[in-house]
Amino acid sequence: YWVETTEADHLREVYEASRPVAAILMLDNYEDLMKACEDTQRSAVLAQIDEKLQTWANAGQGILLKTDRNHYLFLFEEQYFQHFVDEKFSILDTVRAIRVAENIHPTLSIGIGKDSPSIPELYKNAKLSLEMALSRGGDQAVVRNQVDFAFYGGRTKATEKRTKVKSRVMANAFRELIADAGEVY
């Protein structure tokens, strides 16, 4: 006998497409930007960055919240995630194209958590992804799902200025991978 699953398949697709995705965005070199800017230029540069980020986020039909002077939280649905992957997280290039001073350009790191069973775990994976992006030199997007990391961007040369931080970040990421693994050899 046959079982009609069309409606159940459609509901599954709708459910998967509407799953939440969390992204934490961070301006990597915020302090350097502020030092390079004249007082009169700072708010204009930050407004330009905010405008570029908001325009990019609008494609995801989600919400972009500025949580700190150089941190943003972006929440959107899974159905828009592939758009950002297809465009290779073009916001990295868009933000980097803003010129603040000679040889000073803002860079952005993005940590994304997806495919998590709960919102707190989604946020935790986004934070872990951001830490991984920063440990790899910043200026890139890192996506963490339940299994592994995916990396996008990272075209600028990494500057090694946080060796203790990098060691801690890598240790935390390594610990998370071991904790999530079923078997470790």
PLM ranges: what are they?
Residues A17-Q79:
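Catalytic NTP-binding/metal-coordinating core of nucleotidyl cyclase/transferase enzymes
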Residues Y1-D39, S135, V147-K161, R168:
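Sensory coupling linkers of modular signal transduction proteins
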Residues R12-Y15, F89-L92, D115-G138, K157-R168:
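Catalytic-core segments of nucleotide cyclases and related cyclic-nucleotide turnover enzymes
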